[in-house]
């Protein structure tokens, strides 16, 4: 895992808790928000483990049903296929849990925490300007109508490009990767398209 990717994920989970106005936040307030984000991730991992356990049990039950209840080869095959799909989903959820100890270790590094706070601060202090850039770059959409997670992904990327001197392509790629994890199925494509329009806009002097 890359430390800055961890910082971006923590920032994404944190900025949803910030007030929408640009009132000054004390550093200790930002720290509290970030701690809440870590706790949110802990809860997600616990839920993933519980869900994976349930899916494995359902998969096992379907295999047993295929042996005892299937009336023909076709129905047996369908039950086994469902069991395989459930097992794959469970394995993917377990993958998240396996990565979590490394995530927490990195999240406790000062450099990760510092960059998380830089990101949160940039979005909070420049919220109005960032939102104006995004409104101009959206086609047939309004920012307030987007899913909160998508709007915040876009805000983070713009903050990195405009205020934190992160190369445009890096900011876009990282936002797309987070969208694959947190956004809807096609969300990452939408995020990519909007941010490419943003880069053209902010390149104009």
UniProtKB/Swiss-Prot annotation:
SS bond partners: none
Pfam families referenced in this protein's UniProt entry, alphabetically: NusB
Transmembrane spans: none
Gene3D superfamilies recorded: NusB-like
Function of the protein: Involved in transcription antitermination. Required for transcription of ribosomal RNA (rRNA) genes. Binds specifically to the boxA antiterminator sequence of the ribosomal RNA (rrn) operons.
Similarity-based family: Belongs to the NusB family.
Protein name: Transcription antitermination protein NusB
Organism: Acaryochloris marina (strain MBIC 11017)
């Amino acid at each position: 895992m890359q430390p800055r990717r961890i910082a971006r994920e923590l920032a994404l989970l944190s900025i949803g808790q910030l007030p929408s106005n640009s009132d000054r936040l004390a550093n200790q307030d930002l720290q509290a928000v970030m701690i809440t984000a870590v706790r949110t991730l802990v809860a997600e991992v616990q839920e993933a483990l519980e869900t994976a356990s349930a899916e494995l049990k359902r998969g096992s039950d379907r295999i047993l049903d295929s042996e005892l209840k299937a009336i023909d080869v076709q129905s047996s095959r369908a039950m086994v296929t469902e069991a395989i799909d459930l097992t794959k989903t469970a394995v993917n959820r377990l993958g998240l849990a396996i990565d979590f100890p490394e995530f927490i270790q990195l999240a406790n590094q000062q450099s990760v925490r510092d960059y998380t706070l830089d990101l949160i601060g940039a979005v909070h202090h420049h919220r109005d300007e960032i939102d104006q850039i995004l409104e101009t770059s959206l086609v047939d959409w309004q920012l307030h109508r987007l899913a909160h997670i998508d709007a915040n992904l876009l805000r983070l990327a713009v903050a990195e490009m405009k205020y934190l001197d992160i190369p445009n392509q890096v900011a876009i790629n990282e936002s797309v990767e987070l969208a694959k994890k947190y956004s809807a199925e096609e969300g990452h494509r939408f995020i990519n398209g909007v941010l490419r329009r943003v880069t053209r806009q902010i390149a104009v002097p």
